[in-house]
Amino acid sequence: MRVGALDVGEARIGLAVGEEGVPLASGRGYLVRKTLEEDVEALLDFVRREGLGKLVVGLPLRTDLKESAQAGKVLPLVEALRARGVEVELWDERFTTKLAQERLKHAPKRLRRDKGKLDELAAVVLLEDYLARGI
């Protein structure tokens, strides 16, 4: 089954896709956040376009494993997607942005400065972690 991943931030949503059974993911860019309904419509289009059976959405947790303040901004999007029939699985996204920054460390400066590229790569890291666990 094809699986997508979302790294949901304040301004952008990083996108990635992969295949269950294969621990590699590919970035698919990012969406600039608008209203909740516009975000949901854009993500439904992403799900259809990529032929996804499931979305893995990063859940921002604190180091003590409790939901962070940002989680309260992610959950309404998750519930809206579920209400539209999308299978969504929440996944611990702690350190995904740090790992994405590490991957970008030796990239050209224009890529390192592109915050959207960082969001996309964070979604890739998130999905690769999910796929590597074979769930």
UniProtKB/Swiss-Prot annotation:
It comes from the Bacteria. Signal peptide: none annotated. SUPFAM superfamilies: Ribonuclease H-like (SSF53098). GO terms for biological process: rRNA 5'-end processing. Its EC number is 3.1.-.-. One of its GO terms (cellular component) is cytosol. Pfam families: RuvX. Could be a nuclease involved in processing of the 5'-end of pre-16S rRNA. Belongs to the YqgF nuclease family. This is Putative pre-16S rRNA nuclease. It comes from Thermus thermophilus (strain ATCC 27634 / DSM 579 / HB8).
